[in-house]
Structures are given as structure tokens and as C-alpha cells.
Design a protein with these regions (language model features):
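Single conserved hydrophobic/aromatic residue that forms the stacking wall/gate
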Residues: 1-13
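Surface loop/turn signatures of beta-propeller and other carbohydrate-active proteins
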Residues: 7, 34-63, 96-128, 157-168
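Entry beta-strands of beta-propeller and related beta-repeat scaffolds
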Residues: 10-11, 68-71, 135-137
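Residue-level signature of beta-propeller blades and closely related beta-rich strand-turn architectures
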Residues: 15, 75-77, 142-144
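Short, solvent-exposed loop/turn segments at conserved positions within beta-propeller repeat blades
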Residues: 18-23, 80-84
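Beta-propeller blade signature
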Residues: 24-32, 85-94, 151-158
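Loop/turn-rich, solvent-exposed surfaces of beta-rich toroidal or solenoidal domains
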Residues: 57-103
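Blade-level signature of beta-propeller repeat domains, shared across WD40, Kelch, NHL, RCC1
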Residues: 130-164
């Protein structure tokens, strides 16, 4: 069988088209969730050269908290050939285009065998999350072979973001 993958040429085209050097996360807004084509795209965050998050992408759905919108994303260094790790953003409640905080280092990275050995080794890739009784449950793929769940107290993560990771 043939496996279809994004080519380097395609990635370069996309970056040139949108005027960014590295893969980025964008936002669009729609009143009816049906009409998107005529809506403008807004750059939220871009990858950072020479860091653990040179190449980034959206992951879990945002969670509305009193502090703002909590959003997790994945990042990978070396142009996408290194470990996939997880970072967090805190966006303004009223204007989610405004990034209030961004973790400088990953909050989750490959550590256990089910994250380091598999189809794509050294990869944690969050795909879903939920808060139950103040605990954030993050469901993620490990090494593109396993499914895992990581937990933390939501309040602790929000405190870390607001006290240590402010963008302003």
C-alpha cells in the first residue's frame, strides 16, 4: 500500500503562502460553524527556531477557565525529526487571539517505553482533554502505537502559566 505524507515542498509552499517561516497555529471564527472560506485566518503562535517547538501544531480542544482559554499543542525540534512534546497556552477569555501565557519548556515529553518505542518513537501527541473534579485529564498517543492519559490539577497548571509563563 502507498502511504501519503506531506512533502517538504508542500510544507515550504504553505509557509510561503501564509508568510511564516515555521509551522504555526492559526485561528478562524465562524458564527454558524459552516461558513469558513470567507473568514480571515489569524496567526496565533508560530514555531520558534532552535527550540523544542520549532514545528508546532494544535492538539486538544481549548478549555474555558476563569483565567482564560487553556490550549495544549504539540511541538517538535529539528524540523520535525526529533521528539514530539506538549506545551500549553493561556488565551484571553474575551479575545482568544491574545496569548496571555506560553510554556517555555514542554509540560509533557516522551519518557516511558510506550512513548519511546513504536511506529514514531519518542512521541507524545495530545488529542483530547477533560476536567473532572479539578483534575485535567489529557489523552494522548504514545509513539503512534499506544494511548495514554496524563493528569494534573488544573489549578496548578493555570498557576504555573499565570505566574511563570506570562507573555506580557
Amino acid at each position: 500500500s502507498t502511504r501519503v505524507r506531506s512533502s517538504a515542498a508542500s510544507d515550504v509552499y504553505k509557509r510561503q503562502r501564509y508568510g511564516v517561516k515555521y509551522p504555526s497555529i492559526w485561528l478562524k471564527f465562524s458564527d454558524d460553524l459552516l461558513a469558513w472560506e470567507d473568514k480571515p485566518s489569524h496567526l496565533l503562535i508560530a514555531g520558534r527556531e532552535g527550540t523544542w517547538e520549532e514545528k508546532i501544531g494544535g492538539s486538544t480542544p481549548p478549555i474555558l477557565t476563569e483565567a482564560g482559554w487553556l490550549t495544549l499543542y504539540h511541538g517538535v525540534a529539528d524540523g520535525g525529526t526529533a521528539e514530539y512534546r506538549v506545551g500549553a497556552l493561556l488565551l484571553d477569555r474575551e479575545n482568544p487571539l491574545r496569548v496571555l501565557a506560553r510554556t517555555p519548556e514542554p509540560i509533557l515529553e516522551p519518557e516511558f517505553f510506550y512513548e519511546t518505542e513504536g511506529f514514531y518513537s519518542h512521541c507524545v501527541f495530545p488529542t483530547g482533554n477533560v476536567v473532572v473534579d479539578g483534575v485535567l485529564y489529557v489523552y494522548y498517543g504514545g509513539a503512534d502505537k499506544y494511548v495514554g492519559v496524563a493528569t494534573c490539577r488544573l489549578e496548578e497548571l493555570l498557576n504555573y502559566l499565570t505566574e511563570k509563563c506570562r507573555c506580557e
